[in-house]
Amino acid sequence: MMKKLLLLLICLATVIISGCGDKFAKEKEAISKAEKTAMSMEVPVLVKPDPSQQPPPAKEDYTRYQAGLNKLIAAENKMLVEMRKSDAQIATLLGKAEKEEEKKDLRQFRDKVRQDRISFVKKISQGRLSGDTFIVGVGSTWQEVEMVYGKPESTGNQFPGTKQYVYKGLKFEDIIGGGVPSPERLKKWVSRTVQSVTMTGKNVTSDAGVTIGMTRDQVYKVLKAKYVKKNSRLTTNELKAERTNKSDGFDAVTQFAMEETAPYNLFLEFKKGKLFRYIVAQN
């Protein structure tokens, strides 16, 4: 009897010391369930046609891709509604948290939610991205960018025919193509995917391993390590680059691809021999 009473007192003391368990357990469980439900929605598996391949993709390949992209974006819009709710709920819980331990636990929970989203986006992005990437990149939908990085800090200085999502150290962008667009075409234009990414912050590392502040030799070392020749028109397996070798200047790497991505161009701006701006863009 005394042994049972002692065990009961020990358990009671443990509960008191630990603050009676997780204060926000129910809320976190509900958020996790909503996130899981959102990411279990059916999405089409897309493979973006690669014009550098031989023979080049047929018109039907592009038509099929565009139709699938429409379905994907529709599903992702529904997911984002739930994810934005989750973000708002987590922010509310952080505002209610009184103890530092509670805040720390909620931040860890928020990071776990983001990591789950990143894993999901990586899975559904396979076969659609080009060049160097930043988890998301050229070929990603705007919805996927927000899933990974959250709502943009700003949308840049947009004008008709452009779209930008700006984050600390990163800018995702799309610009209408096909020459000078007519007013009618500008009015109807809707951006669906990212076409270029610019990295300027030291807080970011590309998936190839490039960071701002690297020397020219460091940049090319990591790019060569990740480069995979995928353009059948290229006659060599070597990384194709136009280097200025000037302390201040631009370099261009053409048809850069990794194991997971299709060929795309890279533009490197150096100042005082260090990488200052890194752009993934078609031209």
Give the ranges of each region predicted by the language model:
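Repeat-blade elements of multi-bladed beta-propeller folds
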Residues: S247-T254
